[in-house]
Amino acid sequence: MTSRLLETGSTPFIRNTAAQQLADVQKQHPDELFNLLGRILPYLRSKSWDTRAAAAKAIGLIVANADTFDPNQDDGQEIKKAENDDLDVDIKSEEELLSPMDDSLLQLERLDLPSILKYGKRLLGSAGKEYEYSLAAMDPASRLQHQKKTLTSRLGLAGEYIEEDLINDNDLVSKPVVKEEPSFVASREHSIQGTSQPLASPIEPANGEESGLSKRQLNQLKRKNKQSARMGANKVRVVDLSSRRASENVTTPSVATPYPIKSENGEERNGDSKPDYFSLDRSAGDDESKIVSEFKGASVPENPLLQPESTEEGPNPNWPFELMCDILMVDLFDPNWEIRHGAAMALREVIRIQGAGAGRVQGKSRAENDILNRKWLDDLACRLLCVLMLDRFGDYISDNVVAPIRETVGQTLGALLSQLPSRSVISVYKCLYRIIMQTDLGLERPIWEVCHGGMIGLRYLVAVRKDLLIKDSKLMDGVLEAVMKGLGDYDDDVRAVSAATLVPIAEEFVKTRQSTLGTLMTIVWDCLSNLQDDLSASTGSVMDLLAKLCTFQEVLDAMKANAAVNPESSFGKLVPRLYPFLRHTITSVRSAVLRALMTFLQLEGEGTDEWVDGKTVRLIFQNLLVERNEGVLKQSLQVWSELLNSLETRGSFKSESDLLSHIKPLITLSMGPFGVPRYPVPMDASLFIKPSGLPFPSSAAAPARSSPASNTPEGTKGRRRKSEKKEAPPPSAHNVDGHMLQGDIDLVGADTMLRSKIYAARALGQLLFVWDQNQLPSLWQSILEGLNHSASTSQLASAMIVEEYAKLSGPSGRYASTLCENLRPIIEGERPPWYSDIACYLHVARAQCHSLLNTFRDHAHVPGSRLPVLAVIVQGDPEAGPNAFSLSDAEKVIGPDFERLKKGLTPAQRITALQVLNDTRATAESAVNEARNVREQRDLRVRAAAAGALVALSDIPKKPSHIIKGMMDSIKKEENAELQQRSATAITSLVEYYTTSAKRGPVDKVIGNLVKYCCVDTSETPEFHHNAMLEKSILSLRKEEDRRDHPDAAKFEREAKEARIMRRGAKEALEQLAVKFGSELMAKVPNLASLIERPLKEALAADELPANIRDPENELGQEVVDGLSTLRAILPKFHSGLYPWVVDLLPLVVKALQCKLSVIRYAAAKCFATICSVITVEGMTMLVEKVLPMINDALDVHHRQGAVECIYHLIHVMEDGILPYVIFLVVPVLGRMSDSDNEVRLLATTSFATLVKLVPLEAGIPDPPGLSEELLKGRDRERQFMAQMLDVRKVEEFKIPVAIKAELRPYQQEGVNWLAFLNRYNLHGILCDDMGLGKTLQTICIVASDHHMRAEEFARTQKPEVRKLPSLIVCPPSLSGHWQQELKQYAPFLNCVAYVGPPAERSRLQSALPNADIVVTSYDICRNDNEVLNPINWNYCVLDEGHLIKNPKAKATIAVKRLLSNHRLILSGTPIQNNVLELWSLFDFLMPGFLGTEKVFLDRFAKPIAASRFSKSSSKEQEAGALAIEALHKQVLPFLLRRLKEEVLNDLPPKIIQNYYCDPSELQRKLFEDFTKKEQKALQDKVGSTEKADKEHIFQALQYMRRLCNSPALVVKEGHKQYNEVQQYLAAKHSNIRDVAHAPKLSALRDLLIDCGIGVDSPSEGDLSGASYVSPHRALIFCQMKEMLDIVQSEVFNKLLPSVQFLRLDGSVEATRRQDIVNRFNTDPSYDVLLLTTSVGGLGLNLTGADTVIFVEHDWNPQKDIQAMDRAHRIGQKKVVNVYRLITRGTLEEKILNLQRFKIDVASTVVNQQNAGLGTMDTDQLLDLFNLGETAETAEKPSDAAGNEVDMVDIDGNVKEKGKKGWLDDLGELWDDRQYQEEYNLDSFLATMKG
């Protein structure tokens, strides 16, 4: 299944594809219906809007593929459609025939609206609690029943709703507790998200009487229990909806989980906890539970949760979706808005498709079922109406409030209404009418949210059931009445919905209610007049309604009729009412009024355009000058164009009119200058007019800067307020434009000001083109004067106006010659010395120069007479003359003058003043440079605009260098993208001019420069000679490193910005050329084709690159790179007619991929990726046929690097488009993940991470067109491989070709199949089966088989790559004998050499190593004899207990990783022991680079997981930790195989783990207290220290505490501080330090052994003699320290239990003798006990002769203890294994268990039984497999979620305290306006209803 893709899919396309695939599963497997729905249901509760929407879509598609439920289909009648239902059908008589329906069904006729509003529980965003804690303990079915029962009360239909007290006094009463005996029956636990299993056992008061508690204590207990419930309910649970009823029966589970049975009170563990072997909570008392694990019972058939329960007579007769809809209907009233939203969307989809079957039952007649269906649907309608009334959640994200719940419920109601009979629709309408009117609901005051909800419901009713509106006049009248009431409502959101309600039925209304049109239009126009609040968001909706209505002739006729009666109702009077809203505060309103005006302009008929006059023209043009939103600006220009068309049609430009008086001020405003940051130049506000036509007062133009809050550009809806007055919109409407009018560049931005000038120029160009030519001279005079204006921005605007006019008129215009004469001086002559609008920069430069001179005077004491005098007035000032301060004056001061004055200083003056002089000069130089740059930029802009105008006028001189330079400078340096785009257009026009003329002129040079500029950005086009020496590198990786290391970062960034600007301009010009010339591009501009094609052919024609290509003076290499880069840049704009030309170049690009130079491969890879994205079929065919074979070229690393780099870029360029081809790429890339080249490996790993995400979606994509049959067959083979890799159960059975002397169990055969699969595809993995499942045997099978197959292949082919090679087994010393024995037993035909023992013995064996089949050695020997083992090429390198290489810095780890082998395999039952960083080290051995570098892994996984452990971690840290664990688990999943014993061994008896607590002795307690008092302060000071000595001190203290827990004899020795004191104490007690009385663990050990029958006297009766007596149990006793074993041996066995026969295995036993001791213990039952240290006896040994395991001490590493206990609990064990852990109560040992628990949780989450193959993991989870990061660049960056809080600041800007939670930390993900617009588009909804 792909259900998780609904949540994790990165794009809507992926999520929608996942939804479609789930639907396809339903189509192919109809029996999977309820499983699929159960999987998807939890995603409806997601916090993510996109996830909920995708889940709802998936449900809709699945339900659509399910059979329609019609129990009466055999009757031969179809279910009657609601649309055909007659209003007057009387079905009352039929109803009477039926038995009464369930009382829980609500009826529309009896719905008590006043009670619901009075008593119903309000539905807000969240009730402050995410779960009903009191329901958390119920199973899903019980919870659903309870919620259904209480729903009537929550709706207010049973009086006032009072929340239940979560925990009342009765809950505190002690209940009798039945003591349970240990049992091996455990029920499988399942939960639905938000619920859990029982949380805690009944609370038992200490004194047994609840009456003994005071009221305060009872309240305290309530709070504690409430908190406990909350904690339980909020835990994250694995969602599993696959079973509903199974848990109700006490049966044996199909998969058991570790299950605790309390020995004291039978309390159950939380159902959501991990399989955990340790319990910690000290505050809850001793954990004396028994954990029963690993018992495999018979399977229990499970029914999906959502599947209706079968009855005794057969399948459930009800509608199959009834149970799911019950759950969703309860969720409709959840306190959390996201849950309500998801439920409403899902109900919408189900009802839309399957609503006709709802409520129907098998066995009823058609008539009866029709009634049942109507009643069920009526009930749902009632509930939806209740939500519309009770919901109060609104989102003020946009201009209008969006109520997502009410909107979605409205859509659900719409879907429902399409299924309802007419009678019910009328009932729904009546309820909605009452909700809107609110006249009979008993409300003290109207509630706007209720009215809003009712109006939304009415909107969808109107849209869906137009048929009833047409039939029923009363219904139409009622709707109109409600809408008119809504349009007059005090709340603007209600007005907005009311207007939107009428839009879908506008046509029907106009045709059927012509008599009321006049009234309605009056109301609509009055609604606009009465809008008082400047934030009234409804204005846009009202205008849209108005525009829609005015498209009907009937409405226009009605308006004309109104106008005849009342002149105030004419178009000329009404339309101007819209003008105030042109500059409304809210963007959507400004947009709506423009849409309305556009509609009015397009109307035809007499009198419809009488409102168009000079004032209208002026107001629209003012929009262009002050509008900051680009979308509204474009609309304004469209309205302007339509306005000019209307005026031209009327002939307004032909005669002298009042237009001229309006146009001149507009020209003045258009050419007005604007300033620079900090020095604004305001517009002349007196030239603006108000909507009334009066001039705009300049005093109101600019808002005060001191109160920015009053000038927010977009209004934000805040408190609703009702205005009693009805006046015209206030004159402050222009406040939205205050900053534009003031010219406030700091707030508005220079780009926005420039854009307004550009649009104004376009508008004036259009106006001048249509204006009567005879009236133009006066206008042109004003414009041409602007070309000589003192401000650069005025000159720019004038030139742009001329250009826009010329584009329309061409060179033939009457004024062309005049315009050209005025423009040429700008291009050819000198520019003015300075511009007035940038004079401020010169003032700053002068001030800094003056400061420099003052510094000479004050610090260097230079006489004033020697200092130059600076003019006060600067150039650009209005009164500036020829002697004003200029830029050259400034340059003289900081240059010659500075040097002259410095030379005149005495040595003493230099010493004291030189530093400050240099600093002041640097400041002045910076100011001068800034002034110079600004001046050059303004010159460039004016020249470029003038050049563009001359080109548009076709005034191209014979020597066009000045024109070309003007435009090309803009292409190179213009920072403003729109001005640069204009220059690109002008260049295109110039090239077109020359291509149509006889001479080509400078075209080739222009094209050459554009290509050069396009390739100047080294981040896109690398420098050839700079990278020419790189051969075995992948530049895609190197370039990311280069970007980070630059000595002068500021200079680098400045140069990089300049290069980006130049490339952007050149790329724009080339793209415009491609669009302009289309398929003729290469013919019209042959130089472009030559620049791309020639270098490729010249450099790549031969097999080798030209020998001199690296010569510094040779440009061919750079030309190749530039050609590829240029093709990549402009290819997306190519006409399809040019594609064959590109395809002809593909072989050369492929050849470039094989090039030995990294830089050419890089350029070719990026170019090839772009070609594939544009010309997909031909490109991908070439990829599969030519590029992919290169990736396996073992002889040439350049081929592999080129191919993998190409795939890397292809993935990122094509994104979703690569889906049909993804299967071709996975296997080749996978093979390179273990490449010998590090860079190939890294890039392959990164690419594979992205590719595998898409594999689940690939199957549903249709075959790509154009691929050959051969390729399609190849794709099927690749699919088979992927299926095997992702599901171990699909791996082909591997027949072992050699005679293994063992019968493999089925799971062992599966393991060998998996190992053979890895072998076949040269993959490497970890076999991490549970301890005792035969990893050794499986390994022997695959190694022996591979040796045999290689020998056969070599005999047949004599190929050196399959020659005989030895395999190496590396294991702990204890297991070397074990491996020898296993090999001898199972594969005696293999020649095995044990490379162990002392150096002399190993030296003797060295010559035999290359010829052996198997070499067994240890990790230490690998480290010591590295020079012996390294030179040998091994076939297999197997690391047994591979977790021993967990420390990547250990010498043994480094040595092992240097070994060379064909196949690498790790065996480990516990691959993660302490932290996840260990897993990185393991994979660094298997596939270096697969998990990134150690630092990346640490940041991405290890740190978040570790940070989430701390109790003070924030919820975001905890979430980051959980996500990191899950991501890591998925990433390593395909390369680990793990099976648990309880899964695969039916015959393995259970293992019971129990804690055995001992109270510390008096002596121990005394020593503890003394140590704590004396050492605690010192230890606290040293915690966190990085000093080695401090760390050692802490470690020694911990060791002291651990030893003391065991026996005081281990710590109290001579030299101990309390030695004498202890001796005195012992003397007084007549005891000694080794007495078991002082070490309770020893006496506890004795008691345990005796209880087990070990050490008891032999039976005195019967036929057994003492000599022949054998104990019923045999034990393994584990200690950490050999010293403790000595004490156990001497004090317990020798003194207390002398009859016990025992063996001992610790570090003092030679490695070669250890297996003998194991064999003796297993075969000789007379030995009762085996004493072991955990380090020696805890790994790999088979000790099934014992059935009792006792831990006297515990390891910090929990996996070591688990490993040790599983020495007995493994294959071959016939008895129940009891594990006892001796724990000294209240000591450090309990802390150790706490730490163990966390480590086990992490390990079991990352590596668990899902690693049995991806078949056990939903394919939905595959999306985020291998998520190393999107690119190599992001992979190197540390994750933000790593829990690092250093230097973080909180919301107030203060430095955040570590671990402290901010008040916004838990804020959920924000959703955006786009989601609302997409979801609540009425047209889209209606389309789905039809579909």
UniProtKB/Swiss-Prot annotation:
HEAT repeats lie at residues 30-68, 473-511, 569-606, 957-996, 1139-1177, 1181-1216, 1219-1257, 1526-1565. A motif (DEAH box) lies at residues 1440-1443. GO terms for biological process: negative regulation of DNA-templated transcription; nucleolar large rRNA transcription by RNA polymerase I; regulation of RNA polymerase II transcription preinitiation complex assembly; rRNA processing. Residues 1663-1813 form the Helicase C-terminal domain. The gene is mot1. This is TATA-binding protein-associated factor mot1. It is an enzyme of class 3 (hydrolase). Keywords: ATP-binding, DNA-binding, Helicase, Hydrolase, Nucleotide-binding, Nucleus, Repeat, Transcription, Transcription regulation.
